[in-house]
């Protein structure tokens, strides 16, 4: 699992555009956070708040669908909102109250949905 996650992180890092005029420092998560195995059942329990805005059918009416996305993508997004690296007040507030285990659980749950 760790090798797969590391490979995904590397590919995301290498595919990041270096030609943009305005660049932020790369957001880095520690390996200990990336190694957390998310509990899908716990993620399902927590997901009701997310599903208020993120539609189950992944339709995008200004709010992206998250079902079926890669675990690493969801983990990074939630940590970026939590740390105010990404801008969106609602997502910053929602992610701000989540712990590492809760983020891993939500990521595992939403990644399991197709």
Predicted regions and their residues:
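The canonical Cys-X-X-Cys-His
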Residues: 43, 48-57, 106, 110
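C-terminal capping alpha-helices of c-type cytochrome domains
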Residues: 21, 25, 77, 96-114
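Electron-transfer interface patches adjacent to heme c in soluble/periplasmic c-type cytochromes
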Residues: 64-69, 93-103
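Short Fe-S-cluster ligation motifs
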Residues: 79-100
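Electrostatic cytochrome c docking/interface patches
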Residues: 21-46
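Gly/Gly-Pro-rich "capping" loops immediately C-terminal to redox-active cysteine motifs
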Residues: 40, 44, 58-86
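Bacterial N-terminal signal peptides
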Residues: 7-13
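N-terminal signal peptide c-region/cleavage motif recognized by signal peptidases
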Residues: 15-17
């Amino acid at each position: 699992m760790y090798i797969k996650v590391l490979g995904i992180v590397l590919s995301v890092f290498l595919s990041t555009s270096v030609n943009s005029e305005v660049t932020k420092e790369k957001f880095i998560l520690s390996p200990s956070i990336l190694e957390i195995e998310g509990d899908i059942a716990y993620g399902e329990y927590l997901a009701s708040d997310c599903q208020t805005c993120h539609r189950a059918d992944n339709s995008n009416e200004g709010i992206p669908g998250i079902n079926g996305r890669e675990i690493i993508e969801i983990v990074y997004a939630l940590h970026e909102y939590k740390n105010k690296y990404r801008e969106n007040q609602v997502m910053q507030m929602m992610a701000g109250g989540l712990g590492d285990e809760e983020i891993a659980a939500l990521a595992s749950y939403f990644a399991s949905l197709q």
